[in-house]
């Protein structure tokens, strides 16, 4: 049996990979729980979201203050407690003040730096490696 943290089924988590294509950068945010670690904007799907893409877009706005267009489904990665769904978000607008701006920092970084910073969380690193911003093999 997996660790579902008291849930009967794994939590559905929707993640955005915010990309600024002209610069080839990805936007990371700090965790609210641990200010020294970096993550991709992500959070639980809510029934009011409707589709998973809407949840990923909402989380990007709440956690990172970015608006844009979901352009690509990247992957789904199951873990013991959650099922992660990753989407690329082409950023169109960066809000100067956003819902979690007092709780998080955000920073544009290149692919290699992003991979280094989120490598502690295998699901995030795997998804970034499958994104269109990853170097072609």
Q: What residues fall within each predicted segment?
A:
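Active-site-adjacent beta-strand/loop module that shapes the phosphate/pyrophosphate-binding cleft
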Residues: 75-113, 124, 128-134
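Short, well-ordered beta-strand micro-motif
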Residues: 18, 30, 86-90
């Amino acid at each position: 049996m997996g660790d579902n943290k008291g849930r009967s089924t794994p939590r559905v988590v929707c993640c955005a990979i915010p990309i600024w294509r002209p610069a080839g950068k990805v936007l990371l945010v700090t965790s609210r729980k641990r200010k020294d670690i970096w993550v991709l904007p992500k959070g639980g799907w809510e029934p009011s979201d409707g589709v998973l893409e809407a949840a990923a877009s909402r989380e990007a706005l709440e956690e990172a203050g970015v608006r844009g267009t979901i352009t690509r489904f990247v992957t789904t990665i199951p873990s013991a407690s959650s099922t992660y769904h990753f989407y690329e978000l082409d950023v169109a607008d960066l809000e100067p003040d956003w819902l979690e701006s007092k709780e998080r920092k955000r920073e544009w970084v290149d692919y290699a730096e992003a991979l280094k910073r989120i490598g502690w969380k295998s699901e995030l690193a795997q998804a970034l490696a499958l994104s269109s911003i990853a170097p072609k093999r």
